[in-house]
A protein has these predicted regions:
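Hydrophobic, aromatic-rich membrane-embedded alpha-helical segments
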Residues: 21-57
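Internal/C-terminal transmembrane anchor helices
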Residues: 116-148
Length: 481
């Protein structure tokens, strides 16, 4: 006569795995397991498996709560650290796959057997699939965007050291005790019929590191005789400013980016972008304030960038030409018609920014300033999240900068502060005091210093040509910019 297994009393059988008697019961436990992984396995009398899954789930939640960022700075630090972000994305993907396995496994071990009706099989499978999809879809998008973000940071901000960017800055002290940080915004034109890049758009943005208040300075592309700082090797080469024999167009401010690396390679030291180093020093000499960093947007990709944002909204006061050359007598192929709150796609935004037929450089500079403001307005969190994949793909192709990766969280926080204030702009237009062909740089320095003075000072000493961006970009029918 056989004896019962050790630990089981004679006359009793060990309880085996349990299944639900009805499909709704099984689905209910499956839903509970989605919230509390392991609960379904415990109900099915798989004690060891259920306890292990439950313990691992609780441990994962506790670890995530401890490791997750608890404030904006922590979130930004994670977002701009590619290695940490990639690890977080991989771990999230693994946890998501494990969660799906637990949910599906719970239904498999609890569903009634045999199924009495075909609809039970179809209905149960559809419910579990929908349950998984509800969680997998949004989390999967977050994981995908995390990988895209890591790629963008690596592509744009990893190997971008220049010879002129500030030293002795850290994530803890990003501004090195300074009250302002100055960033040169460049629009570069490297079309198929041009040799090298010509920076036809040059806007120096000066941001208060405490408040985010911003003043921008629009510089004409045809500014001549631009001086370099006294301590620059370029000053020794051009003591009278950037000038020389031959075509005057080769000695304008917009030619510095292209010409200096050709004429004097490596003159400023090792750099990922020698042209950017040169134009930064030229703008510093022209304005009298240090240029810390640059951001260059290639016009050949500007169209894709705006399209990725879903377009921009600007006020069009006068018709803006598409194509056309005034000097050559070539008429435009079309016009952007006037109107308030015009929503422009990438193609039309590009021509709004660069259209030159029938307009002067100063009108074009004003439109470019309005484009910058429109892009800032579109860069709200909802729009960025909704279009992140397209923006990441476009941005990594068309944007270059020497802003260090470790300073990105500080710059994002500063940009958020800047959005709370109305920016001021100074355009250096031709006037009785200023001529791009024979500029008075002492006058330019004075204008810059006056514009950067505290707001209370402006009540008594208003800087010439200073405008409020919101007013300057408002709809004024028939009024040129």
């Amino acid at each position: 006569m056989s004896m019962p297994p050790y630990g089981i009393k004679p006359g009793r059988r060990k309880a085996g795995p349990h299944r639900c008697s009805a499909l709704p019961h099984a689905l209910g436990w499956t839903l509970l397991s989605a919230v509390l992984p392991g609960a379904g396995f415990l109900h099915s009398r798989r004690q060891r498996l259920g306890s292990l899954v439950l313990l691992l789930s609780v441990a994962t939640v506790v670890w995530a709560a401890v490791a997750a960022p608890h404030n904006l700075r922590g979130a930004l630090d994670l977002a701009f650290n590619p290695s940490r972000l990639t690890r977080a994305a991989v771990l999230t993907a693994v946890c998501l796959a494990a969660w799906v396995a637990v949910v599906v496994g719970t239904f498999v071990v609890l569903r009634p057997r045999p199924a009495t009706h075909r609809w039970q099989v179809i209905g149960g499978s559809a419910f579990v699939s929908a349950l998984c999809l509800v969680v997998v879809a949004p989390v999967g998008l977050v994981v995908r965007d995390a990988f895209a973000q890591a790629h963008v940071v690596n592509a744009v901000f990893t190997h971008n050291r220049t010879a002129t960017r500030p030293t002795h800055v850290t994530a803890e002290d990003p501004w090195n005790g300074r009250s302002r940080v100055n960033v040169l915004l460049l629009g570069g034109d490297s079309g198929p019929y041009r040799e090298g890049t010509r920076t036809d758009t040059m806007i120096l943005a000066s941001l208060d590191t405490h408040t985010g208040r911003t003043v921008t300075f629009g510089l004409p592309r045809n500014l001549m005789d631009v001086p370099f700082p006294d301590n620059s090797p370029l000053h020794a080469l051009y003591p009278d400013g950037f000038t020389g024999p031959g075509d005057p167009g080769s000695w304008m401010l917009n030619a510095v980016y292209r010409e200096i690396p050709i004429l004097h390679p490596h003159v400023l030291g090792a750099s990922a972008d020698e042209g950017a180093d040169a134009i930064k020093q030229a703008v510093e000499g022209a304005t009298g304030i240090p240029v810390d960093y640059f951001v260059l947007v290639d016009f050949t990709g500007f169209r894709q960038l705006v399209d990725a944002m879903g377009g921009i909204t600007v006020n069009v006061n006068v018709p803006v030409a598409i194509n056309g050359q005034t000097d050559a007598g070539i008429p435009p192929t079309g016009y952007i018609q006037p109107g308030p709150d015009q929503h422009l796609d990438g193609f039309h935004a590009l021509w709004y920014a660069r259209g030159r037929y029938g307009a002067d450089d100063y009108q074009r500079m004003s439109r470019q300033r309005c484009v910058v403001n429109a892009i800032i307005d579109e860069a709200n969190p909802v729009n960025l999240l909704r279009r992140y994949q397209a923006l990441a793909a476009a941005g990594s192709r068309v944007v270059s900068t020497d802003i260090p990766q470790q300073l990105l969280p500080a710059f994002v926080q500063l940009a958020l502060k800047a959005k709370d204030h109305r920016a001021k702009s100074v355009l250096f237009r031709s006037s009785a005091d200023f001529s791009p062909g024979s500029p008075d740089f002492d006058y330019m320095h004075q204008v810059v210093q006056t514009a950067l003075a505290p707001p209370a000072h402006h009540r008594h000493h208003a800087p010439p040509s200073t405008e409020d961006d919101q007013d300057a970009c408002a709809y004024h029918p028939g009024q040129s910019y």
